[in-house]
């Protein structure tokens, strides 16, 4: 049986943390920022963890990463 391949789009967008959680960037921060408030843009900074309901999809897209 051939090796399972990682989805190339997923490996560019997600990082697996040592504890097994997956880190992702925030959406809605690329363009059309003039109508967004400063508070909203500030809260969209940084990265967050992928929700546990989506971890099954992450395990399929990133095989062999200890998820």
From Swiss-Prot:
A GO BP term here is: translation
Stored Pfam families: Ribosomal_L35p (PF01632)
Q: Which domain of life is it from?
A: Bacteria
Q: Per its record, what are the GO molecular function terms?
A: structural constituent of ribosome
> In which residue ranges is the amino acid composition biased (Basic residues)?
1-16
InterPro entries given in the database record: Ribosomal_bL35, Ribosomal_bL35-like, Ribosomal_bL35_CS, Ribosomal_bL35_sf
Query: Which keywords does the record carry?
Result: Ribonucleoprotein, Ribosomal protein
Residues of the region (Disordered) are 1-24
Its Gene Ontology cellular component terms are: cytosolic large ribosomal subunit
Q: Which family does it belong to?
A: Belongs to the bacterial ribosomal protein bL35 family.
Instruction: Name it.
Output: Large ribosomal subunit protein bL35
């Amino acid at each position: 049986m051939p090796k399972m391949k990682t989805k190339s789009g997923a490996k560019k967008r997600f990082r697996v943390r040592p504890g097994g959680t997956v880190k992702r960037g925030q959406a809605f921060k690329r363009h059309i920022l003039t109508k967004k408030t400063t508070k909203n843009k500030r809260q969209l900074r940084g990265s967050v963890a992928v929700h546990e309901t989506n971890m099954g999809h992450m395990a399929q897209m990133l095989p062999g990463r200890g998820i």
